[in-house]
From Swiss-Prot:
Species name: Methanococcus vannielii (strain ATCC 35089 / DSM 1224 / JCM 13029 / OCM 148 / SB)
One BP annotation, GO: riboflavin biosynthetic process
Name of this protein: Riboflavin kinase
Pathway: Cofactor biosynthesis; FMN biosynthesis; FMN from riboflavin (CTP route): step 1/1
GO MF entry, a single one: riboflavin kinase activity
Disulphide connectivity of cysteines: none
Gene for this chain: ribK
UniProtKB keywords: Flavoprotein, FMN, Kinase, Magnesium, Metal-binding, Nucleotide-binding, Transferase
EC number: 2.7.1.161
Cofactor: Mg(2+)
Annotated residues for binding of CDP: G10, F11, G12, E13, G14, K15, V109, N110, L111, R112
Binding site for Mg(2+): T39, N41
Keyword Transferase: yes
Catalyses which reaction(s): riboflavin + CTP = CDP + FMN + H(+)
Amino acid sequence: MKIFGRVVSGFGEGKYFVGLIPYKNKFKELTGFTPYEGTLNIKLKTYFDIDKYDPLEFDGFEIDGKEYFGGKVLLVTLFNKSGKFVDCAIVSPKKTDHSKKTLEIIAPVNLRKFLSLKNLDIVKIIQALK
């Protein structure tokens, strides 16, 4: 798998959700890293079907009567235009306000800062080796 997309602003909700302890612990278990509290959003030209790539699944949970949904994670490597990269993961929640053309990426670092990314920058994503 090799796809290209553009960095876009999200809704600002990634920080909240990734910061929830059950999600943070599950992401660490599935990816091997503690995620930075936030996501990088990548807009694609076409629909992305995560199920084609054998993703890892995670269950939802409940906190104080509020339900939080599960989803899927796919280990990938994200490259900036200079070739600098970070091993990270696509997160595909069962419930999202994003279109199927927008990927949410989690990583152990702030990807915008570490890779010097700004809105509309083009990035390359490849599936990580298992």
